[in-house]
């Protein structure tokens, strides 16, 4: 599975770390991939505009009764912070659930049609744990790049005759198309169900923006701590530039000014305890020559919840939210293709996904709902692309077979196409795991 989370806006709680500004703040895409049944996770952290520091709070500029609709806190920064062990486990649980849902779609579509299935795996590579049930091997594997459902079609050790009508390769194109597309359908349904549960249980959070930028946290021994900034302060202006209530735009102004002024005084206009006053902060010099002060920043907003008053309104809320997330995913995918030179460096692997998910989990349940829903939608959209080793690539081969009057491509050709795609994804995934691991804050401090 390949996920593309490029279009996720940040929320009021999504903190931006002003300590390692190697990367601009950006949105993260995520992609999902399946060869018939093989899934791989590789996200891309892609900015929503050419001005990479320009973040936006809202999806689709929607207006709700109590303010502007906000969506979950997605962010990408150069220094990845995994946070607490509990939040990491929550993020891993979300990713694992998404993999299981996707592969279960393939598995159930095959089983319900009487098609032989031999394996159901989470992860790739060496087997860590396994058990057999009803002639199917269920396994947990070493590399967390996705999962797969295996079929005995080309297994030389299989005792099933090669002409058995219940082998996947011997079924009509419609049956095979259902199996291949079932993972996509499962993720779409799951995303809708997640949003439905969110609306009924906690409602949809909305926000009203206020001038300035909130400082949720000040790191110990940082420039900000040394020069007097405190957690809970609201920054109203920087070097005489007043900060509006446009959320991430105001955050970006602070980021720009701090980055440009290492070892130089920056004057912050602060609101604290009902009083306004100035504080001079001297940013430390980062390893890349930019300034850093060691704080988290977030838009200064007030959050309320909107709950549906009846069943029809529930479905309207859910449908609007689902369409908004889907639109964002499609926009992010379009930007990935049309601005590839700018977005290629934002590709990230499972470690970065878990880091972002952990940050979401540390915030509140609203963000975790939207994190899971968005990843499912990304998974479905990306898998529709007609590329080797993706569900869409397999569907394209089935369509080509139908156009050719049921004449299949030579087995060697089809296997070569899929195998090359899978190997590329595996090597890319391993590379990204190493890259993202080296970006972890505690690893960078050790190096």
From Swiss-Prot:
PDZ domain sequence ranges: 202-244
Principal subcellular localization: plastid
Residues annotated to bind Zn(2+): 102, 106
UniProt protein name: Membrane metalloprotease ARASP, chloroplastic
PANTHER family documented for this protein: MEMBRANE METALLOPROTEASE ARASP, CHLOROPLASTIC, REGULATOR OF SIGMA-E PROTEASE RSEP
Keyword Secreted part of the UniProt annotation: no
An example Gene Ontology CC term for this record: chloroplast inner membrane
Gene coding for it: ARASP
Cofactors: Zn(2+)
